[in-house]
Regions:
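C-terminal motif of bacterial Sec signal peptides marking the signal peptidase cleavage site
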Residues: 4-7
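N-terminal "domain-start" segment that seeds a small globular fold
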Residues: 9-40
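A short helix-to-beta-strand connector/capping loop
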Residues: 23-26, 74-76, 100-104
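Short active-site neighborhood of thiol/selenol oxidoreductases, capturing the structured segment around
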Residues: 39-60, 66
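Structural microenvironment flanking redox-active thiols in thiol-disulfide oxidoreductases
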Residues: 60-97, 111-116
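Short, internal strand/loop/helix patches
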Residues: 96-127, 131
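Thiol-/selenol-based redox modules, centered on thioredoxin-like
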Residues: 128-152
Length: 152
């Protein structure tokens, strides 16, 4: 049987109040694109975590907008995580001109690890954390970049 954990969703669903379990950087294990193990807990303060699928139209548009407005995100580390193959993730990073941005990283996580930390989510799922590594706001689904910038 197949269980769908992530899906593309047009509707933007912001959550204003942080859930108690997402009040700081989660402990999501992932691998860098070079195969090195890491965890989202190692992210610095001032981070944006983006869970995405490489073939999701909404994720592609979100990445394009972030690349176009990358100057607004220069003081934040952005980590894109997908459960797709490393090859597909690398191609996504290159296609949207994010591969060589110093503050943008890409990683690969297992579906079950994402589900354990975030539950069933729509992609792109964007989580903003402040300098103290505390949760600020999440956005589920494609979101105008101007909305994200308001919370940086």
């Amino acid at each position: 049987s197949t269980i769908c954990l992530w899906n593309c969703d047009q509707a933007r669903k912001p959550t204003e109040a942080p859930k108690e379990e997402i009040n700081e950087l989660p402990h999501l294990a992932y691998s860098t694109l070079k195969g090195e193990p890491s965890t989202t807990r190692s992210l610095p303060g001032g981070s944006i975590l983006i869970l995405f699928n490489t073939d999701c139209d909404h994720c592609q548009r979100e990445a394009q907008e972030i690349a176009e407005k990358s100057e607004a995100f220069k003081n934040y580390e952005i980590l894109f995580i997908a459960a797709d193959s490393v090859h597909h993730i690398e191609n996504f990073a290159k296609a949207y001109d994010l591969a060589n941005k110093p503050n943008v990283k890409f990683g690969r996580a297992e579906y079950q690890d994402v589900y354990k930390n975030f539950g069933s989510i729509s992609t792109p799922a964007i989580y903003i954390y402040n300098r103290e590594r505390k949760f600020v706001r999440s956005f589920l689904g494609e979101t105008p970049v101007e909305e994200l910038i308001k919370y940086l």
